[in-house]
Amino acid sequence: MKICKCFKKQKKNIKSLNLYHHYKFPPPLEPDYKIRKYDKKIFKCKLCGHFTASHKINVNEFYKKNYSVISHGEKMKIKFNKILNLKSKSDNYHRIKRFLKYFKKFKKKNLSLLDVGSGLSIFIFGLRKIVKWKLIGVEPDINFVKFAKTLKLKVIHSNLKSGILKNQKFNIISLNKIIEHVKDPVKLLKISNKYLLNDGHIYIEVPDGKRASKDLNGHLREEFFVDHLHVFTQKSLKSCIELSGFKIINLKSIKEKSGKYTLFAFAKKLKLNEN
C-alpha cells in the first residue's frame, strides 16, 4: 500500500493512493538521463491531491556530477546568459521581484541568506546586485559549484544534510525547486529549520501538480519528470511546511513566464512556545 509521505500524522486515515499515471517511456521533453529500463508510476493522494513517484531509478546519482550537464548542457555560461538576457521574461526575474517585495523592510539590513541547491546560482547572483546581504549557496553538483566560482559567489560543494555548515545560522533560507527532488521533503525542511535564526524566514518553490495535471496531456509536462519524486498541491505544501515547524505567511499558485505551474511560499520559523 502506497502512503503519502507528506502526511505522516494522517497515515491511519489514508487507505491507498490512486494511480495517476504509469510511465513505460520518458515524456518527450524530459532530459535524457540514460535510464536503461524506464518504469515509473505516479500516485495521487486521495486526501490532499499530492503526487508521489514510485520507481527504482536512482535519482541520487543525477545530482553528484551529471545532472548539471544533462539538464543544462556543458556550456553553462551560455545558459546562464540566456536567462539573464530574458530579463522580465524570465522566471528568475519575477522570483527576485516577489522575494524582495516580501523582504523590502530588510533590504538595507545586513542579513544572511542560505540558498539550498543553488544550481546555476542565478538567484543569488541577481540578489547580489541589489542587496548587501551575506549570500551563501550549498550545491551537491560539482559542475554547478565550479561555475559559481567563476561568478565569484560562495557556493559550498555539499548538501544540507551533511552538517558541513556546523553551527551557522541564517536569517533566510531559500529552496527554489528543491524539495520535490528528495524522498522526504518534511525531513529536509526540518533540517533547514535548524539552520535558521529564531526570527528566520524560509522561501520555497515547488511544481504545482494540481494545475499541471489539468492540462491536456498534463502527465507529460515537466512537473512530472523523473527527477521529481514529489509534485505538490497547495494543501500538501501547506502540510509539509507546517509539519516542519513553520508558520505560513503567504502561499500562492502561479503560472510562470516559462509556462511552468509553480507554488511558492514564505514562512516564518515558529518559536519554541508556538510549536
Tell what function each PLM region has.
Residues 186-201:
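A short glycine-rich, Lys/Arg-flanked "PGG" loop and its adjoining helix->strand segment in the class I
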Residues 183-187, 214:
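Short N-terminal helix/helix-N-cap motif within the alpha/beta-hydrolase-1
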Residues 135, 202-204:
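Hydrophobic/aromatic residues located in beta-strands of well-ordered beta-sheets
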Residues 20-28, 204-230, 235-240:
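Short, glycine-/aromatic-enriched active-site segment of Class I SAM-dependent methyltransferases
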Residues 177-181:
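A short His-aromatic
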Residues 208-210, 255-258:
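Short beta-strand->alpha-helix junction loop in the catalytic core
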Residues 5-14, 234-252:
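A SAM-dependent methyltransferase catalytic signature shared across enzymes that methylate proteins
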Residues 1-168, 172-176, 186-189, 253, ...:
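Conserved N-terminal segment of class I S-adenosyl-L-methionine
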